Curated annotation (Swiss-Prot):
Subunit-structure text: Part of the 30S ribosomal subunit.
Listed GO biological process terms: translation
UniProt keyword annotation of Ribonucleoprotein present: yes
InterPro entries per record: NA-bd_OB-fold, Ribosomal_uS17, Ribosomal_uS17_bact/chlr, Ribosomal_uS17_CS
Function noted in UniProt: One of the primary rRNA binding proteins, it binds specifically to the 5'-end of 16S ribosomal RNA.
UniProt keyword Magnesium present: no
Protein name: Small ribosomal subunit protein uS17
GO molecular-function terms, A-Z: rRNA binding; structural constituent of ribosome
Gene (name only): rpsQ
Pfam short name (any one): Ribosomal_S17
Amino acid sequence: MSDKIRTLQGRVTSNKMDKSITVAVERLVKHPIYGKFIKRTTKIHAHDELNQCNEGDIVTIRECRPLSKTKSWTLVDVVSKA
C-alpha cells in the first residue's frame, strides 16, 4: 500500500452545506476505439472547516479518513477565488 496521500484539484460547485463543499474534478479519458480524449467529471464531497469556499473557486483537496457517509476528502487550500 502506498504512503502517498492523494490530492486533487477541482472547482467548487456547491457550498450550501455547513462545513462541506462539493468539488467537480475533471479528468481526460481516452476513448478505447476512436482514441479521442473525452472530459469526465467526478463530484466529490469535501470538508471545509472554516466555510471559506464559494461556488466557482478552484481548490485543492486531499483524501482523509471517512468523516460521514459520503465525505472522505478535506480542503487543503483555495488556489483561486471566483
